[in-house]
Amino acid sequence: MAKNSMVERDRKRRKLAQKYSAKRERLKAIIESPESSVEERFEAQLKLQQIPRNASPVRQRNRCAKSGRPRGYYRKFGLARNELRRAAMNGEIPGLTLSSW
């Protein structure tokens, strides 16, 4: 089980990223646009720097929905490997069968 503080920190980052996503995309479009002037780009860069650092989607970490474990995460299921195995053994994931050969 992951520390609750780490799970909450990641939840806060996701919330901030969602809040500032539209503004961030607008500013990045101005910066990357070849039609915008140098002054516009500079102003957009300054405004982008004013956005909180934790609002960047890169700072988010994929975590297991049940345990909060950051490693061994399967995107398709949203679970860590050990929770995925436990759920598969209990038959909680439809269509998932363990292979044996």
From Swiss-Prot:
Stretch list, region Disordered: 1-20
Segments of skewed composition (Basic and acidic residues): 1-10
Coiled-coil region list: none
GO cellular component: cytoplasm; small ribosomal subunit
Annotated GO MF terms: rRNA binding; structural constituent of ribosome
Iron listed as a keyword: no
InterPro entries hit by this protein: Ribosomal_uS14, Ribosomal_uS14_bac/plastid
Keyword terms: Ribonucleoprotein, Ribosomal protein, RNA-binding, rRNA-binding
BP GO annotations: translation
Quaternary assembly: Part of the 30S ribosomal subunit. Contacts proteins S3 and S10.
NCBIfam families in UniProt: PRK08881.1
Family: Belongs to the universal ribosomal protein uS14 family.
Role played: Binds 16S rRNA, required for the assembly of 30S particles and may also be responsible for determining the conformation of the 16S rRNA at the A site.
Protein name: Small ribosomal subunit protein uS14
Organism: Halorhodospira halophila (strain DSM 244 / SL1) (Ectothiorhodospira halophila (strain DSM 244 / SL1))
Gene assigned in the entry: rpsN
